UniProtKB/Swiss-Prot annotation:
Domain of life, source organism: Eukaryota
Record InterPro entries: EF-hand-dom_pair, EF_Hand_1_Ca_BS, EF_hand_dom
Misc note: The sarcoplasmic calcium-binding proteins are abundant in the muscle of arthropods, mollusks, annelids, and protochordates. This protein has three functional calcium-binding sites; potential site 4 has lost affinity for calcium.
Task of the protein: Like parvalbumins, SCPs seem to be more abundant in fast contracting muscles, but no functional relationship can be established from this distribution.
Binding site for Ca(2+) 1: D19, N21, D23, S25, D30
Gene Ontology terms for molecular function: calcium ion binding
Keywords: Calcium, Metal-binding, Muscle protein, Repeat
Domain EF-hand: 5-41, 57-92, 102-137, 138-173
Binding, Ca(2+) 3: D115, S117, D119, E126
Residues annotated for Ca(2+) 2 binding in this entry: D70, N72, D74, E81
Record carries keyword Metal-binding: yes
Regions annotated as coiled coil: none
Name this protein carries in UniProt: Sarcoplasmic calcium-binding proteins I, III, and IV
Amino acid sequence: GLNDFQKQKIKFTFDFFLDYNKDGSIQWEDFEEMIKRYKEVNKGSLSDADYKSMQASLEDEWRDLKGRADINKDDVVSWEEYLAMWEKTIATCKSVADLPAWCQNRIPFLFKGMDVSGDGIVDLEEFQNYCKNFQLQCADVPAVYNVITDGGKVTFDLNRYKELYYRLLTSPAADAGNTLMGQKP
């Protein structure tokens, strides 16, 4: 099973990335709210074509997540169902490629939420804005960003984000994956 620290991180992903209306469960309405927030953070820069593409992608994500986690088939994924899905998934997950399809599809979307300039790299200012816009409790943003970039040796691009997101979900101990929660390891 998962240790308490892993459960805490999985709970963060549930609360922060999925349960947008904070009612303790995930349903389609949370995905709709996510699109609204994404548009706000990106200052309405989402074209109609991008919006339609994102909506279709999120509909696919919702179907996949629901199919994996909605044990009682009530069109709602509870925290308990979500945790049970991750306990099963993490037991066999060895890389980003082993993550559920809905989760892999979400990674570029989440990265774009940080990379508001669209240049493919999240700089310190974008990371600071991300922490502020999403109310992350981050006491020292530059220090956290320094962990993300390994002291400037690594570019904070989509591949780095994938690695950190995988570690956030699967690592049994505090490591660089914590930075996506605004925390140092």
